[in-house]
Amino acid sequence: MSGLLTDPEQRAQEPRYPGFVLGLDVGSSVIRCHVYDRAARVCGSSVQKVENLYPQIGWVEIDPDVLWIQFVAVIKEAVKAAGIQMNQIVGLGISTQRATFITWNKKTGNHFHNFISWQDLRAVELVKSWNNSLLMKIFHSSCRVLHFFTRSKRLFTASLFTFTTQQTSLRLVWILQNLTEVQKAVEEENCCFGTIDTWLLYKLTKGSVYATDFSNASTTGLFDPYKMCWSGMITSLISIPLSLLPPVRDTSHNFGSVDEEIFGVPIPIVALVADQQSAMFGECCFQTGDVKLTMGTGTFLDINTGNSLQQTTGGFYPLIGWKIGQEVVCLAESNAGDTGTAIKWAQQLDLFTDAAETEKMAKSLEDSEGVCFVPSFSGLQAPLNDPWACASFMGLKPSTSKYHLVRAILESIAFRNKQLYEMMKKEIHIPVRKIRADGGVCKNGFVMQMTSDLINENIDRPADIDMSCLGAASLAGLAVGFWTDKEELKKLRQSEVVFKPQKKCQEYEMSLENWAKAVKRSMNWYNKT
């Protein structure tokens, strides 16, 4: 394959040879691969559980050797399940969880440590000290003054910039400060840094290709989306050498081919994309004002903002959705952690056997009998922004049953959805065109209906909820001419059900007020100062 087909007319003239595309998603809970045909039907699948490691309280890691074995295995298993041969795969698209990173030896390819997950809290004290530092105050003040004179959007964004534990930036600083082996390698220019996409690309090509894409780069906290390059300002501020960061390429791009030794044939790698941006693409949220609500391990609310970046003061941050040739699509995003995490935790406590049971359990009750759950195993994100908040149940009584606990957990997910949506309406001045949901938790009809009621909007749930896989496959398919253009993708999308408001938001007012009170009491719990 000599290069990408970026012109729709050029693609249309290409022979539409038979074949399949692979969409692979390395999520926070599972790693999944689907084989898609031209009708975007899943012909074969494989899934394995991602094994997160918890070496210390608040630390979350992934063993790269285990992840690599799983990655190769799910591709082989999915292709086998589809009943096809590897040489029938015309392109591979890879979607990955974002801001989870690793460093490795440039000469040997050996990693210095495990992947440090986006959920990891080891840098929480660094985040606190940096955000309260004199240097940050000077940085913000300087940017505000310069913005006053120049009216530059970029400087306005910089004046609001704060570090979070979810960004790669200060977790990488923590590694540089605490692992002498990495420090030495950086000094000797023998260190590679990469998020999961970069590392997989490096492994798949046996070290011959080192790169990331714009969607993944923009979620690290080290990228300048206005200049479309790594941020000299931020990297200088926290002393991370720019030479440590990989080249940034288009999302739909000919990154190279998988080394033949791995699968027996050189499969073209033609899309790298961050999971939320991939889900946005898979949902066909191509127009300004299109909204995606992903409920997986965490909840992510994204709105397509066209070609303009939107910075807010409350908690929506600008991202690059994807870059394909000259087209750059921007998103504004906010998130809430511990969505699927809370359900999984409840399952481990034997409140239910299968997550599918929770919908029926919640619907069997009129309400939670005043029980509130605060989903804060990894702190509370926007609009509360409290990394020291604790997860908690409040309002427990002798009459409280596991059914009340389960309903309270599901209600908390819907309440967080409402918080994010209200903040989006307040801060992003773009009319909402449509809302589409995906992720494992969107299979729960109770959460979906309650969210629809609370925000008073229709929410479309697709027939295929694995949108990150489909998005990666769609981007790969467009790159090789497997699909002609976005219009063709829109025609292939299938909706399963549209949830419409059935109750007025006011009917939830008392429950929402009680929950907000519980959240307030859970905040700042772990703060040592």
UniProtKB/Swiss-Prot annotation:
GO BP terms in the entry: glycerol catabolic process; glycerol metabolic process; glycerol-3-phosphate biosynthetic process; triglyceride metabolic process
Binding sites annotated in the UniProt record for glycerol: 98, 275-276
Pathway assigned to this chain's UniProt record: Polyol metabolism; glycerol degradation via glycerol kinase pathway; sn-glycerol 3-phosphate from glycerol: step 1/1
A Pfam family reported for this protein in Swiss-Prot or TrEMBL: FGGY_C
Catalytic activity: glycerol + ATP = sn-glycerol 3-phosphate + ADP + H(+)
UniProt family annotation: Belongs to the FGGY kinase family.
EC number, UniProt record: 2.7.1.30
Residues bound to ATP: 28-29, 297, 340, 440
Molecular function GO labels: ATP binding; glycerol kinase activity
Protein name per Swiss-Prot or TrEMBL: Glycerol kinase 5
Gene: GK5
Described purpose of this protein according to its UniProt entry: Skin-specific kinase that plays a key role in glycerol metabolism, catalyzing its phosphorylation to produce sn-glycerol 3-phosphate. Involved in skin-specific regulation of sterol regulatory element-binding protein (SREBP) processing and lipid biosynthesis.
Broad class of the protein's primary localization: cytoplasm
A GO cellular component entry from the record: cytoplasm
Compartments, record wording: Cytoplasm
UniProt keyword annotations, A-Z: ATP-binding, Cytoplasm, Glycerol metabolism, Kinase, Nucleotide-binding, Transferase
Originating organism: Homo sapiens
CDD domains with a match to the protein in the record: ASKHA_NBD_FGGY_GK5-like (cd07793)
